């Protein structure tokens, strides 16, 4: 009986030792991985302001996390595609995030801190970079229900509900111009989110607040279905 207990204690001690060693190894690997990530992030951030760095590496690592290297493919449905977006529009939005005049929820959480680190030169460089990227090519066909109805709203508006045609500012093909953003191929969820913000006044823009105040949720989805399919 005594021998059995001793062996049992010995096994427990060996297990405790192995668990401790495994824990130390895990902590060590975690520390090394974290250190490596910090190093890579630091190198990427250092490259942002370097005129000698290849163009993609001038993009802040903060931008790449959500918008991707080229701004074509985003990780989240409410994160906008930036590839091919108009320079003046992007500059205006980054400045609005920086001075907190664009104050929607995601802007406050994610974009305010990022924009605070950008001076005028970096804002211009980022706008130039993403503007120069080729917009994504959408596959043919309707990805979301309501695209047909959305096309009618976009091109003709809804006169009896005092909703003007979107194409008057954003162009017949949704390409936009100057201060009016490109909407063709934009993310479905992002369009709905921003129309909601304009509708309820969360995102302040005198023109869009007036236009979106009468639009229904169903109409938002239809317009988003059409634009995201372009």
From Swiss-Prot:
GO terms for molecular function: electron transfer activity; heme binding; iron ion binding. Heme c 1 binds at residues 63, 66-67. The keyword Metal-binding applies. Its main location: periplasm. PROSITE patterns: CYTC. Gene3D superfamilies: Cytochrome c-like domain (1.10.760.10). Residues 1-47 form the signal peptide. InterPro entries: Cyt_c-like_dom, Cyt_c-like_dom_sf, Cytochrome_c4-like, Cytochrome_c_Oxidase_Subunit. The keyword Iron applies. This is Cytochrome c-552. It comes from Acidithiobacillus ferridurans.
